């Protein structure tokens, strides 16, 4: 007796969602694993930082995206290990067998050997990062209104975007 092929997709970003959608109409069981329970639309994070959009406008629940697909299961777990020889994925809560594995975990920052920069910059890759930047900008603007030191005000109102 043959079973339906099991596909595990690690990552709920653009690549993971694209792969999962492509497999939604096939006779396979798809397990989408991501450490977040939502897809984050990163191209609009700058609008969260600017206060134009709310976080819920750029974070779409993964289960909602695939609610109509009977062959897709979404799990909010973090992958700890992959054993390719036994075709098994180990998460912080479970272990899963697979026939096919798609790794779509996205990208990371590159500070080009200058990792010390991390402590001095704001990044726009997460909701937390966007909200930290928004709060920093608001704090700087408010502080600039109450200072009488022109040089301090100039610093408070100076931002570099790279």
Write out the residue ranges for each language-model feature:
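Beta1-alpha1 glycine-rich phosphate/pyrophosphate-binding loop at the start
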Residues: 2-72, 154-155, 160-161
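FAD-binding core/adjacent interface of flavoenzyme oxidoreductases
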Residues: 1-4, 72-160
